[in-house]
C-alpha cells in the first residue's frame, strides 16, 4: 500500500513575465523591474538609472500598453498560455506519480506570479524539492541566467534549504525539434509553402555575445536542425533576430531589415516563426504578426504569415514532460510506485 503523501515535489514552469494589465502604470511597473535587472541591461547602474527614469519610463509605457491592449484577452496571452501549459503538465505528472502528489506551477522572472513569491508559498506548504524548468529553449544570461539569479537570491534568505534542480535549456532536444518541424508542416498543409521561411529569434546586444553568451550559437543550431528535419535547401530559409532596443548594436541579421530587403528584391511570400518563444506574447503577436507583416508588404511583398509558437500543443507538453519527469522521478524514485 503506497502512502498518501502531501505534495512535496513542485515543478515550476518559469517564463519571462508580463504586465498585470494593459495600462501605462502597469506596464511602467513591469518595465522598471525588467529593465533594472543587470542581466538584461549591462550598463553602469548609476548611468542606466538616469536613462531609465528620465527617458525610458516617462515615454515608453504608454506606447507599449497600447500594443498590449491590442492582444489582451482577459489576461496577457503569455500568462494565459503558461497557465494552460501548467494545467496540462500537472495532469500528466500527477497521473504518472499517483498516489504521490507532484504539482506544477507557473512563475515569472518579472511581474506576477513572481518566482520568489511562488517558492515562498510552496515552501510553506511543505514542498522540499523544486524542479525548475525555464521555458527558454536557448539559454542566455539575459533570460535563463536571470532565473538562476532569482533562485540564488531566494536561497540566501533560507535557513533550511530545499532540493533544487534546474533545466538549463533544450535548444537541440529531439522532441523540441520535431515539435517545431511538425507545427510548420501542419501550417504549410493549410497555407502552402512560401518562397522563404524565416526563423526569427529575440535578439541580444552584440557585446553580450562577444563576452561569451552562447545564445546566438544555440539559436543557429535550433534553426539548422529544424531546417534539416524539413529538408529545406540553404536558400529556402534564414535565421534572424528581432526586438532590438536602444542604439547599441545587436546580433544580426535584423528581422525587419531582412524582410524589407526581401520585399524590395522581389520575394513575394514569407512565413515566419520564433522558436525562442514557448508561448505567444507581445513580441510574436504584435511585433512579428502585425508590425513586421506591414514592413514586408509595404516593401513589395505579397503574402506574409506568422506561424504560432508551440503554446499548449500536445507535442509541446510531451517535450515539457520528457524534460521534467526524469528529474521528478529521480527524487520520487526512492518511493515505490513511480510509473
Swiss-Prot record:
Any GO molecular function: metal ion binding
Compartment(s): Cytoplasm
GO biological process terms, semicolon-separated: heme biosynthetic process
Enzyme class: lyase
Documented EC number(s): 4.98.1.1
Keyword terms of this UniProt record: Cytoplasm, Heme biosynthesis, Iron, Lyase, Metal-binding, Porphyrin biosynthesis
Presence of the UniProt keyword Lyase in the record: yes
Primary subcellular site in the record, as a coarse category: cytoplasm
Catalytic activity from the UniProt record: heme b + 2 H(+) = protoporphyrin IX + Fe(2+)
Pfam families: Ferrochelatase (PF00762)
Binding site for Fe cation: 202, 283
Superkingdom assignment: Bacteria
GO CC, alphabetical: cytoplasm
Coiled coil, from the record: none
Pathways per UniProt: Porphyrin-containing compound metabolism; protoheme biosynthesis; protoheme from protoporphyrin-IX: step 1/1
Protein role: Catalyzes the ferrous insertion into protoporphyrin IX.
Family recorded in the similarity comment: Belongs to the ferrochelatase family.
Protein name per the record: Ferrochelatase
Lineage: Bacteria, Pseudomonadati, Pseudomonadota, Gammaproteobacteria, Moraxellales
Gene (UniProt): hemH
Amino acid at each position: 500500500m503506497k502512502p498518501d503523501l502531501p505534495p512535496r515535489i513542485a515543478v515550476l514552469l518559469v517564463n519571462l513575465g508580463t504586465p498585470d494589465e494593459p495600462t501605462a502604470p502597469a506596464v511602467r511597473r513591469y518595465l522598471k523591474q525588467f529593465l533594472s535587472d543587470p542581466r538584461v541591461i549591462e550598463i553602469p547602474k548609476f548611468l542606466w538609472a538616469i536613462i531609465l527614469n528620465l527617458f525610458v519610463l516617462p515615454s515608453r509605457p504608454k506606447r507599449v500598453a497600447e500594443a498590449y491592449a491590442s492582444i489582451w484577452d482577459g489576461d496577457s496571452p503569455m500568462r494565459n498560455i503558461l497557465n494552460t501549459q501548467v494545467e496540462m503538465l500537472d495532469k500528466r505528472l500527477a497521473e504518472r506519480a499517483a498516489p504521490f502528489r507532484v504539482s506544477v506551477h507557473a512563475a515569472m522572472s518579472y511581474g506576477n506570479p513572481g518566482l520568489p513569491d511562488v517558492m515562498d508559498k510552496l515552501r510553506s506548504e511543505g514542498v522540499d524539492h523544486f524542479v525548475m524548468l525555464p521555458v527558454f529553449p536557448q539559454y542566455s544570461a539575459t533570460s535563463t541566467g536571470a532565473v538562476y539569479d532569482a533562485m540564488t537570491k531566494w536561497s540566501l534568505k533560507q535557513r533550511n534549504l530545499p532540493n533544487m534542480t534546474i533545466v538549463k535549456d533544450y535548444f537541440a532536444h529531439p522532441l523540441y525539434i520535431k515539435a517545431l518541424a511538425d507545427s510548420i508542416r501542419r501550417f504549410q498543409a493549410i497555407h502552402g509553402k512560401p518562397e522563404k521561411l524565416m526563423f526569427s529569434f529575440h535578439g541580444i546586444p552584440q557585446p553580450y555575445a562577444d563576452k561569451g553568451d552562447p545564445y546566438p550559437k544555440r539559436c543557429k543550431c535550433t534553426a539548422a536542425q529544424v531546417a534539416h528535419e524539413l529538408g529545406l535547401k540553404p536558400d529556402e530559409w534564414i535565421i534572424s533576430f528581432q526586438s532590438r532596443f536602444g542604439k547599441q548594436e545587436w546580433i544580426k541579421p535584423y528581422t525587419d531589415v531582412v524582410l524589407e530587403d526581401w520585399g524590395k528584391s522581389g520575394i513575394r511570400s514569407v512565413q515566419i516563426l520564433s522558436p525562442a518563444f514557448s508561448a505567444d506574447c507581445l513580441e510574436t503577436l504584435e511585433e512579428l504578426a502585425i508590425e513586421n507583416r506591414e514592413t514586408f508588404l509595404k516593401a513589395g511583398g505579397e503574402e506574409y504569415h506568422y506561424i504560432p509558437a508551440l503554446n499548449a500543443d500536445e507535442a509541446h507538453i510531451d517535450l515539457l514532460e520528457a524534460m521534467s519527469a526524469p528529474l521528478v522521478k529521480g527524487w520520487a524514485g526512492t518511493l515505490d510506485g513511480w510509473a
